[in-house]
């Protein structure tokens, strides 16, 4: 089903086309939402129309409302089985109660999607793999992102990240990434998993969603992108990096570093977060 198909399936429950499209996006990508997100999506002020819509959701038992911290707003969880069945996702995990520590991530994910609600947003692994291996893209399965690049190139192992991918009318994909303040950021690993796919596409967009608390991290995000895509590693550098990593692994936890001049030069050259991340991915399973 496309986004339009899902909206048409939800509308018979008594919703306007605009409300139905919003609900379809919520159920596919978050399960929860705020009044301000609908107001932004609809291009209206957060007034009577918005409150009436959410009152209807609660009164018809399509959603449950929860008071947010300090009672500054209400969180709405869309859980009604028939609505999810209408969009062909009756077993969606988004129907289940959401842990408090996942709310911010879900809302940020929805914010990212609502930035371009007209895109056809792909949510599942199967949808993503089907789009990129068929049709106009025709990307070989071995070039799709996966956690273990050495694993067999099966499409069901591809796209381990849960972030949705939006598809524009011209076929250009928009890759979404949500930066979370409460967990170790895996942005570099995300970029590396997708690097081969990015290289095969004629055009693509990377959209990074940052919480307000991390607004100052924008420059850092840009620096990571420049590191990964604008500073390629040439074959000789890769060979030297592998040698250096192997020496580090042998040293282990002894904290004894050799006085070998080659090792000292390599340690100085590769003293950067980019290479630390590569080392931990290679030897520490992170």
Residue ranges and their predicted role:
Residues 26, 42, 54-58, 112-120, ...:
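Hydrophobic, Leu/Ile/Phe/Ala-enriched alpha-helical segments that form helix-helix packing faces
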Residues 169-286:
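C-terminal regulatory/effector modules of DNA-binding transcriptional regulators
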Residues 97-188:
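Exposed, interaction-prone assembly regions rather than primary DNA-binding/catalytic cores
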